[in-house]
Amino acid sequence: MKIVVVSSPKDQPNETVEVIRMFDAGLEYFHIRKPRLSKKQLTEYINLFPEKYRKRLVIHSYHGLASTLSLGGIHLSRKHRKRGRFYRLKLFLRRKIERDLVVTRTFHKLTDITNEKRKYSYTFLSPVFDSITHSTLSGGFSKRALLIMIPQAKQPVYAMGGVDADRIPEIADLGFEGAVLLGSVWNSEEAPHIVFKKALAAAKEL
């Protein structure tokens, strides 16, 4: 069971310090989703991380920075996936050259998981449970549907939405290969790296 963490879209006190502590504790990938940051601001944010952790950073915007800053990967949003043939060709060639480049995306429909023909390093399915970040966003899938569809996925699927340490065993039972932490990390009264450690410990007990 893999555990990844997504950044808060808003500013968080000592966010990079907390993420570095997570890396030290065993975090494999940290997804940087900062839609409000300019390219310059995002670059400055990334530069707060030691170089030894750059390959564990996956960015959701300004994908060119993945090459210039030697980052781990890119996450393709709906906007990126809707771009034309030239963009897809450029991405295909880039993956041929940068063979270790992590490429991910998010699914919001179960049918898309089995119909997707493109190859990704891993994918997110959201929202699996009631969101911690957005109180009005409820889990979108029945347990029965997940048990049927997740095993049919052609690539690794990680559960996102309402995920915390207590959910890890259930996520594994549903067939997911990983879990995505967001609200449980950044909205907790505990330090974010402590929340991550608890989830990682739960995953190791499976």
What are these regions (language model features)?
Residues 6-9, 18, 28-41, 50-115, ...:
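Catalytic beta/alpha-barrel core
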Residues 107, 142-145, 154-165, 171, ...:
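Glycine-rich adenosine-cofactor-binding loop
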Residues 44, 137-146:
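Charged helix-capping and loop-helix junction motifs
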Residues 5, 74-88, 122-137, 168-205:
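Glycine-rich phosphate-binding active-site loops on the catalytic face of alpha/beta enzymes
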Residues 25, 69, 118-119, 152, ...:
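Structural motif
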Residues 23, 43-51, 86-98, 114-117, ...:
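Surface-exposed amphipathic alpha-helices with a cationic face
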Residues 19-20, 46, 63, 113, ...:
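Generic hydrophobic/aromatic pocket-lining and core-packing "Φ" positions
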Residues 1-13, 203:
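Boundary/entry segment of secreted carbohydrate-active catalytic domains
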